[in-house]
Regions:
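Extracytoplasmic/periplasmic substrate-recognition and gating elements
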Residues: 171-175, 179, 185-239
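Anion-binding catalytic surfaces of enzymes that hydrolyze or transfer phosphate/sulfate esters
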Residues: 151, 162-165, 173-174
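Extracytoplasmic ligand-binding site segments that recognize negatively charged/polar headgroups
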Residues: 1-159
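Hydrophobic residues within well-ordered alpha-helices
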Residues: 14, 161-167, 212
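Periplasmic-binding protein-like
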Residues: 87-98, 228-240
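Loop/turn elements at helix/coil->beta-strand transitions in domains of secreted/extracellular proteins
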Residues: 2, 88-92, 145-148, 168-171, ...
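Hydrophobic packing residues within well-ordered alpha-helices of enzyme cores
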Residues: 14, 106, 183-184, 238
Length: 240
């Protein structure tokens, strides 16, 4: 393995176990020319310093997806989502944790209800965090009776939920792929009236990166490839 698509706890674990080559980003012309190296999105990966051991490849943002012909009243906050779920009982759910998207949805509810700032400096012990997020947990418990299968079980993955949405079994889908809706409309999977949306306060987003394995036999080639992936042409082509 030469190049690795990585972010979050996987990057932190690999870096702390000395499995990554670097720092290398300062050797990439396209990184130096087109990337804001001082941006927090580049300097930090899930609050962990990147230190030049990974180069940004793309960004993801949690969005919700609904068919406006079926549900024209799209929720713009957690409180409106509760009313939405109650209006469409049995037709809303989210992927079972620890699914990546399901976890992001729950974290988004936590930030929406409990606020985000307190977690930036909070002591990371179980009891402190548990107490801080209790209002959001109570909110989720209040949703359960109105969810698909009364919240007793949840879809095993975001892929399963996507298929349930496309089949009309549920009326809401959530994804990290902000461009998935347009692609699925073009492919005929979603109706033309399907729309992605976010809460008014926004949703969780993150950056994904490319790293190089420390035991790579072709580190120079990996750097050439990553540099090319940072070019304006390749980045623009990702959104065609």
């Amino acid at each position: 393995i030469d190049m690795i698509w990585i972010n979050g706890e996987n990057f932190q674990s690999a870096k702390e176990k000395d499995m990554l080559y670097g720092p290398f980003t300062d050797k990439l012309p396209n990184f130096n020319d087109y990337v804001d190296a001082d941006s927090e999105d580049v300097k930090l990966d899930f609050a962990y310093p990147t230190d030049g051991y990974e180069a940004p490849y793309g960004k993801a943002q949690v969005v919700m997806v609904a068919d406006t012909a079926v549900t024209p009243d799209l929720p713009t906050s957690a409180e409106e989502l509760k009313a939405f779920v109650q209006k469409y009982p049995g037709k809303v759910t989210y992927p079972a944790l620890p699914d990546f998207t399901g976890s992001a949805f729950v974290r988004n509810i936590i930030y929406e209800i409990c606020g985000y700032e307190q977690f930036l400096t909070m002591e990371a012990d179980k009891e402190t965090v548990k107490e801080a997020i209790e209002p959001a947990m109570e909110y989720l418990r209040e949703l359960n009776p109105y969810l698909w299968n009364q919240g007793k079980t949840f879809p095993d993955s975001s892929t399963t939920l996507d298929n349930m949405f496309a089949d009309g079994e549920v009326v809401l889908y959530m994804t990290y792929g902000a461009y998935d809706t347009a692609v699925n409309i073009a492919d005929g999977k979603y109706t033309e009236t399907t729309q992605s949306f976010q809460f008014d306060k926004g949703t969780i987003g993150n950056t994904n990166f490319m790293a190089i394995a420390k035991n790579s036999a072709n580190k120079a080639g990996a750097m050439v490839a990553i540099n090319e992936m940072l070019s304006p042409e390749v980045q623009a082509d990702r959104y065609d």
